[in-house]
Amino acid sequence: MSEELPPSEAPRPDEADAVDETRATGETRGAAQEPGASDADAWATACAEDLEAEKARRRAAYGPPPGSAAEELRRLVDTVADKLSGLQSPLLGQVAGPAAQQVVRQVVQQAKAAVEPVIERNPDLFDHLAAAGGELLAAYRSAVQNQERRWTTGDTAPKDPSDPRDLDERGTDGRDEGDGGTGPGQRIDLD
């Protein structure tokens, strides 16, 4: 208890010499010149540079990242429009060719005019639809994988009498059908 700790604002003995030298020479340090601040700035700068380099590497390897669903739909409409406009129709022959191309261009322009306002008003809707589609695809894939696993493993799972997929080869589930009575129900043996 006889030891007293210096107040927290007081410099440590090794820092006291540096503070005295600074005061003696008239140099001052700003808040940005503190050792911790410059280290943090250097660290942030290095992290930002690394992140930009990684993004550039991925763009070079995989191409530009996909945009929002609205942008992707807009690109799809433009691509389809370009392909349809450039098609030569062999069915219509040389006589109807220019007229048919004009009709196709007009239809494409009308489709673009109808789609653009919807995309502009509801860009988030397409992101939500894309997310919902991804969830549906995942659910479908899971169901198909489970069914394929069941088909390929030889059906070693225990049979559930209430599951219509588990009926035996005769199409029955093991319950007594009775004498083929007049009603649509099945006879249940209570004894």
From Swiss-Prot:
One record GO biological process: glucose metabolic process
Keyword match Zinc: no
Superkingdom of the organism of origin: Bacteria
Region (Disordered): 1-42, 145-191
InterPro entries recorded: DUF5304 (IPR035183)
Function: May be involved in glucose transport or metabolism.
Subunit structure: It may form a heterotetramer of two glucokinase subunits (glk) with two ORF2 proteins.
Protein name per Swiss-Prot or TrEMBL: Uncharacterized protein SCO2127
